[in-house]
Amino acid sequence: MFNTNTSNISTNVYGLSQKTRALSHITAEADVNRFLVGTTALREENEIALLEAKEGEGVRCLSIFPHPKEIHSITSCPFDSSLFFSVYNTSGGGNNNSNNTNNNDNTNNNTNNNDFKSSLWRINESMDSIEELFELKGHTGIIKPILCDPSGSNNFIISLDDSNIRLWSKIDDQNEPTVIKQFGNLSKLSVGSINPNISNQLATANDVNIKGWDFRNAKETFSMDKAHSEQIRDIDFNPNKPYYLLSAGDDCKLKIWDTRQTRDPVKIFSGHNHWIWSAKFNRYHDQLIITSSSDNTVKLWNLYSLSSAFNSENNISNSNEQQHSQQPNEQQPQQPPQPVKQKKNKRNEDQLIKTYEEHEDSVYNISWSSSNFLFASLSYDGRFVVNNVPKEYSDILSYI
């Protein structure tokens, strides 16, 4: 089912012969860029590919694991590289018009007869097989991607289906977790994101709305009603600034929000000409954002004005000015006024950096890697692509 030919691994593209939509970076592997990719075949055996990307060497397949039924999402556990969750449709009655974007919507509610499940799996030490450890039971409707603690602990996970949010107990490979809290009771839940900077804070998207939650107390903490004009496909918290959240969806807009002032977004980017399926902050340089769309492209954005780099550089500048102003006057010889040269630095501009066009089908998923500037994208036709932030940006950002 897979193109396992590794004789030419200098390419940044790896082709799978089945349709795909599930992609997860293995975050527990800090020193290598490894990803799990799952297929969504309706009537054939499905598989998960373990792929590795090395700069200068391209992409290669390390192993292939059989997996039951069509895979809709994968979440690698940040506390153990051998563990991952998958969400899969056991009925096999999903959409089968692969070339029609409208029929590839994994968040619509017209699939009531489908039986979605989510299980925790373990990759064995020799990386040649996987074992199902347990199933997260009790969901109704379509299960969304499982959310793990972004701090890397195994203290809890969060799952979402079409209407409810569930907080689960500690995850390990010995004991099945239990549901600690269930809340939400919403319509058309599509995606969630855990804030890595504020304890117990979760954001969810349902239809065109965004809500914030204290998930330990099951209480709503903020709300953006009609955040988008059409369905929201992805949300993601800034990993370095506590109150900033991005959202993207079917209105082709990428929006940035301050969760303390939710009336209007603080920034809007336009550039895609069809639905945005995935949008992610860079964990190390949060001014970098990647988006993927059913216009078959991936876009890289620069959001300097709302980044932690902007705050840091302004603080340093203000500190230097204050130190200079506090020096005794006798140590400051009078100098004639000098014209200030304003050097334009494109790193400091909020703008589209680059559009990547290696895909020929809807790009459902994207993910940053363990490396600061390498990212992966996955399209429905089975094409897995790795790319880098342009050198002119990465060279500058490396010194921040």
Swiss-Prot record:
GO terms for cellular component: phagocytic vesicle. Keywords: Repeat, WD repeat. The keyword Repeat applies. InterPro entries: EIPR1 (IPR040323), Quinoprotein_ADH-like_sf (IPR011047), WD40/YVTN_repeat-like_dom_sf (IPR015943), WD40_repeat_CS (IPR019775), WD40_rpt (IPR001680). It comes from the Eukaryota. WD repeats lie at residues 138-178, 227-267, 271-311, 358-397. Residues 95-114, 314-348 are annotated as: Disordered. Gene3D superfamilies: YVTN repeat-like/Quinoprotein amine dehydrogenase. Residues 96-114, 314-333 have a biased composition (Low complexity). Belongs to the WD repeat EIPR1 family. This is EARP-interacting protein homolog. The lineage of its organism: Eukaryota, Amoebozoa, Evosea, Eumycetozoa, Dictyostelia. The gene is eipr1.
